[in-house]
Each structure stands twice: as C-alpha cells, then as structure tokens.
Amino acid sequence: MFRLAAVASVCLASALVAPAALAQTAEPHRTVLKTADLTGTDKEIIIALLEVPPGAFIARHTHPGEEAVYVLEGARLQMPDGKEIDRPPGQAGVNVRDVPHAGYKVVGDKTLKLLTVHIVDKGKPMTVPAP
C-alpha cells in the first residue's frame, strides 16, 4: 500500500510539473553569419539569420541604419492591432534608419526564418527598443 501511494505521489508531481516545463516562452534567435567594416565609412554590415518560433514576440524597435529582410521560411503573424497576416517565403523588405517596426507575434505552428542584412553605425547596438 505504501508503495502504491509513493508511486501515485510521483505520478501526480510529474503531471503537475511537466506542463510548466513544456510551457517555456519561445524566444527569437539571431545567428550572425558575417560582420564586416564598410570601406571608407564609419558603418558596418551585419548578415544574420533570425529564427522566430511559434509563440515568440518581436518587440517594436529601430536600427541605427538600414535593414534589408528576406523571408526564407514564412509564417503567420499577429500584428499589434490583433490582425493576422501571412509572411510568405520570398518576400523582401527594407526598414529604414530610426523608424519603429515589428511588434508582432508568430502564431500557428511554423517558425519564421529571415535573412537580414544591416548596414548600421559601427559600434552602436544593432537593435534599439522603440515605444
């Protein structure tokens, strides 16, 4: 009887802890592929892969320079106004210096994968939080 109670306690504890362990917050992950100084300027170029898994949120932000974006693998996004849009593979865009953008969450079951190219002021943070 004691053994059965002990096993039941372990099973109950596992059932209560497992969902919390699985409910970890999804986070975007940026892998810098190449960084180089631009000739004759105080700017640098940063080429990166940005992976945004389902449930992850990209806060509104700016850059101290330009950012070109190419969608490698698309996903569905929930915009700040609650509207959902598709970001298909092959789509490209440019975000200009100091203009806030993003503020979206990836919804559905696909990870958004972006190739980004930044030409930014050398030595400054690549991303600056925006209001």
Task: Name what the model sees in each region.
Residues T35, P54, R76-L77, A92, ...:
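Extracytoplasmic low-complexity repetitive segments enriched in small/polar residues
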Residues E51-V52, P64-Q78:
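Short, conserved beta-strand element in jelly-roll/cupin
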Residues V52-P53, A75, D81-V99:
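Short acidic-glycine-tyrosine-enriched beta hairpin
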Residues F2-V10, S14-A15, P19-I46, G93-V96, ...:
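A short, N-terminal "cap"/entry segment at the start of jelly-roll beta-barrel domains
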Residues V99-G123:
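Ligand-binding loop in jelly-roll beta-barrel domains
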Residues T41-D42, T62-H63, D86, V106-T111:
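Extracellular/periplasmic catalytic domains that process cell-envelope and extracellular macromolecules
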Residues D42-K43, A56-Y70:
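A short beta-loop-beta micro-motif enriched in histidine and acidic residues
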Residues R60, Q78-M79, N95, H101-G108:
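Short beta-strand His + acidic residue motifs that chelate non-heme Fe in jelly-roll/DSBH
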